[in-house]
Amino acid sequence: MVAFEKLEKLLGYSFKNKELLIEALSHPSLRQHHEYKDDKDYERLEFLGDAVLNLVVTEILFKNFANYNEGNLAKIRSYLVCKETICVVGTKLTLKDYIIMTHGEEVAGGRDNPNNIENATEALIAAIYLDSNIETTRNIIGKLWAEFIKIQNLTDYDPKTALQEWAQASSHHLPIYRLIKREGAAHSSTFTVLVKVKDYKQIGTGHSIKEAEKNAARKLLHKLK
């Protein structure tokens, strides 16, 4: 099985026009290299992919979050299409192994550069759109972004689970909760809990440890958005 076939298997999509796939994975550094005759790279596809991703994510949110107002939908969309989220999706697709770049770019760390992974991911979305149709592209984006969209559904009523799934989706360690303060009488205590995921921290308070943990998780999720 060749490399592109492995990627296509991860995508659940086989390209009819392989040249589009190659263009989506071609780093701009190739244009300055005399060994490469084709001057195409992923920048134009990235431009289109950004627009397609925003359209599809907006449509998904509009249909699935009927009780959310425009402001809340905009916040969720900004999280779903931000550089960090796109980079996580591209990393799960192991795009760094497929990006075609010059030796100089690779030596400079280009294969692990989050910007390159993000750009190639958006270009790949555009390539799928041009090679197929909006419906196929919508289905693939829905699958690749499913865990992040699920997190948004969980945030309000089960923030601890939502935070755990965000950590797993982002390849971080699981959240750690620590009681840092207890105030007041036994029958009316206020608890303060610190939650930490990698370098992200937030505190929450409540009249029980469980409530404080939920509030800390909810606040951290909103901070991450």
UniProtKB/Swiss-Prot annotation:
InterPro entries: dsRBD_dom, RNase_III, RNase_III_dom, RNase_III_sf. The active site is at residues 50, 122. Its cofactor is Mg(2+). The keyword Hydrolase applies. The keyword rRNA-binding applies. One of its GO terms (molecular function) is ribonuclease III activity. Mg(2+) binds at residues 46, 119, 122. Its EC number is 3.1.26.3. One of its GO terms (cellular component) is cytoplasm. It is an enzyme of class 3 (hydrolase). It is found in: Cytoplasm. Residues 158-225 form the DRBM domain. Keywords: Cytoplasm, Endonuclease, Hydrolase, Magnesium, Metal-binding, mRNA processing, Nuclease, RNA-binding, rRNA processing, rRNA-binding, tRNA processing. It catalyses: Endonucleolytic cleavage to 5'-phosphomonoester. One of its GO terms (biological process) is rRNA processing. Residues 4-133 form the RNase III domain. PANTHER family: RIBONUCLEASE 3, RIBONUCLEASE III. Homodimer. Belongs to the ribonuclease III family. Digests double-stranded RNA. Involved in the processing of primary rRNA transcript to yield the immediate precursors to the large and small rRNAs (23S and 16S). Processes some mRNAs, and tRNAs when they are encoded in the rRNA operon. Processes pre-crRNA and tracrRNA of type II CRISPR loci if present in the organism. This is Ribonuclease 3.
